[in-house]
Amino acid sequence: MAAAATMAAAARELVLRAGASDMEEEEGPLGAGSGLQEPLQLGELDITSDEFILDEVDVHIQANLEDELVKEALKTGVDLRHYSKQVELELQQIEQKSIRDYIQESENIASLHNQITACDAVLERMEQMLGAFQSDLSSISCEIRTLQEQSGAMNIRLRNRQAVRGKLGELVDGLVVPSALVTAILEAPVTEPRFLEQLQELDAKAAAVREQEARGTAACADVRGVLDRLRVKAVTKIREFILQKIYSFRKPMTNYQIPQTALLKYRFFYQFLLGNERATAKEVRDEYVETLSKIYLSYYRSYVGRLMKVQYEEVAEKDDLMGVEDTAKKGFFSKPSLRSRNTIFTLGTRGAVISPAELEAPILVPHTAQRGEQRYPFEALFRSQHYALLDNSCREYLFICEFFVVSGPAAHDLFHAVMGRTLSMTLKHLESYLADCYDAIAVFLCIHIVLRFRNIAAKRDVPALDRYWEQVLALLWPRFELILEMNVQSVRSTDPQRLGGLDTRPHYITRRYAEFSSALVSINQTIPNERTLQLLGQLQVEVENFVLRVAAEFSSRKEQLVFLINNYDMMLGVLMERAADDSKEVESFQQLLNARTQEFIEELLSPPFGGLVAFVKEAEALIERGQAERLRGEEARVTQLIRGFGSSWKASVESLSQDVMRSFTNFRNGTSIIQGALTQLIQLYHRFHRVLSQPQLRALPARAELINIHHLMVELKKHKPNF
């Protein structure tokens, strides 16, 4: 309906618009209207607003033109005026039909009205009923709130009564002394479990009574006397028991760890004394400290004394230094040496003492070693002594913390009260021994033993020995540095002319250094220390200078090089057995050995092939400077070199090989030198061939006498030594 009305209105406007256009066309420019059947009544026009009205009409028309029905009408070419009248007629018919339908349904509409009126009455009555019900619910809600308040008050009173009953029950239970407690404290032995249980109960009741007395509870006065008498009885029995255990430590041949373990089962006894009778607790603690302090001191003094009796009889003395010659101590009244001084500087199997298996091995038993006539170096005795000290100190510290209920500084103080005299005695003994000790390897091993024992103590969470380890290291490090300085000075002051006959074989002083340095380097690699590397660096510099001083005593350069190579090779070989390949010492001697080996090869090739070497170098220099024409004047010299090489090279190579094998003690090193010399000879001959291939010497008749280089290589391989 609405769409039809809209369409009708749009049609009317279009008809009016179309009519106006038709009039303009028929009238022409003069406005003649003879073509219209009926004049168009436009009414009075307001020419002042004509443009505004036309704009509105235009907008309205454009809007209606968008309607689908209008579009369809325009598309099919329908006469809009006729279509508008048709639509208007249809609207009138629809209106009349609607009126007839309304008249036919008038009775039903009246009946519906009556029903609505009846429903309104029913709803009004229901509203009244619901209002009454709401009023009743409000009164019930008030009653429920009242009951809730009463219930909450009753719950509060109940909880208060229960809390009071619980507090009173706890108070009464805490104050009442049961007969079982009295019987156990008075009659049961302290070792029975029920005595310990009732002692804990007594301690709890005494604490509860003290707390209630502080609050002013009058009932405490009724049980105070009973508790005091029971406390005195318990303290007396506990004191006698603990002191008896402490006195059992004093019996000869007693393993004091057994009574210590027994005391730990009753550690609550001391806690009871500490909380109820501090004077008795102090007495017990002082007695324990005094007893164990004497026991440890006596045990370690005896053990250290007996342990030193199984040390090697021969130890390093102040004259057993690296730079001291073997004949220095020999004299008419001197005692013959039972072992070589060189063993002082070798590690051998001594390094096993810091291995994990040996480090925590059982301690040495002196009387067993004496019966078996076994002897040990100082570091083994040091390890056994300090492992026993470490083990007992850790056990003692943990016992003190657990039994005497101490920790932190208090535990340290109590530990040093027990072990202080023993530790001081051990330090004095070590200081006395080091004053006359010249065995650097032993001292260095002792340093690493201490470093490892310190780590073990840290893992066991026993910091009480930290200060002792620092004191031991403060004794060992200066002595180690002093011994190294003495060895450095001995090498520095050694006069090669006083060492006897010269020999190109490795010198015993360099062998001592190699063994000594490799020993310290291998030990230091386990726990690196920069101070040790610095000291070894000083010693290495002095040994290198010493080797150069001894080499200078030889008259020929060849002998000097043989001596240097033999010593460098020996030191490098010994170092590589124990030290890492990339260590500073290994790299240094490797460079020295390579440099001297190359120089020796050149010195070795110089007598038989010196002329050839000189010519090749001169010719290559001329060619490089662009003066190759000067080679034409060297034809006679070249001819002599070709014929001389061809006639003597085999004998020269054979002599060279024999000379090398006689000069070097290390066959492998000699082999390497021979191979290097032959390789350099082949390279030299190859360079000689290249020089002769120059245009200036290419027509030389003697070139026909040249030995084929491949033939030379095959022949030289026959001289390669095999070992």
From Swiss-Prot:
Instruction: Please list the residues that carry the modification N-acetylalanine.
Output: A2
List GO terms (cellular component aspect).
Answer: cytosol; EARP complex; endosome membrane; GARP complex; Golgi apparatus; membrane; perinuclear region of cytoplasm; postsynapse
The record describes its membrane topology as:
Peripheral membrane protein
Q: What is its main location?
A: Golgi
Source organism's superkingdom?
A: Eukaryota
Transmembrane regions: none
Question: What does the entry give for GO biological process?
Answer: ectodermal cell differentiation; embryonic ectodermal digestive tract development; endocytic recycling; Golgi to vacuole transport; lysosomal transport; protein targeting; protein transport; retrograde transport, endosome to Golgi
Task: Supply the InterPro entries for this chain.
Answer: Vps52, Vps52_C, Vps52_CC
Q: What molecular function does GO assign, one term?
A: syntaxin binding
Q: Please give the coiled-coil regions recorded for this protein.
A: 107-127, 194-215
Q: Which residues carry this modification: Phosphoserine?
A: S355
Subcellular localization: Golgi apparatus, trans-Golgi network membrane; Endosome membrane; Recycling endosome
Expressed, tissue-wise, as follows: Ubiquitous.
Q: Which terms are listed as keywords in the entry?
A: Acetylation, Coiled coil, Endosome, Golgi apparatus, Membrane, Phosphoprotein, Protein transport, Transport
| Record note on quaternary structure | Component of the Golgi-associated retrograde protein (GARP) complex, also called VFT (VPS fifty-three) complex, composed of VPS51, VPS52, VPS53 and VPS54. Component of the endosome-associated retrograde protein (EARP) complex, composed of VPS51, VPS52, VPS53 and VPS50/Syndetin. The EARP complex interacts with EIPR1. EIPR1 interacts with GARP complex and mediates its recruitment to the trans-Golgi network. Interacts with RAB6A and STX10. Interacts with BLTP3B.
Q: What does the function comment of this entry state? A: Acts as a component of the GARP complex that is involved in retrograde transport from early and late endosomes to the trans-Golgi network (TGN). The GARP complex is required for the maintenance of the cycling of mannose 6-phosphate receptors between the TGN and endosomes, this cycling is necessary for proper lysosomal sorting of acid hydrolases such as CTSD. Acts as a component of the EARP complex that is involved in endocytic recycling. The EARP complex associates with Rab4-positive endosomes and promotes recycling of internalized transferrin receptor (TFRC) to the plasma membrane.
Q: Which family does it belong to?
A: Belongs to the VPS52 family.
Protein name in UniProt:
Vacuolar protein sorting-associated protein 52 homolog
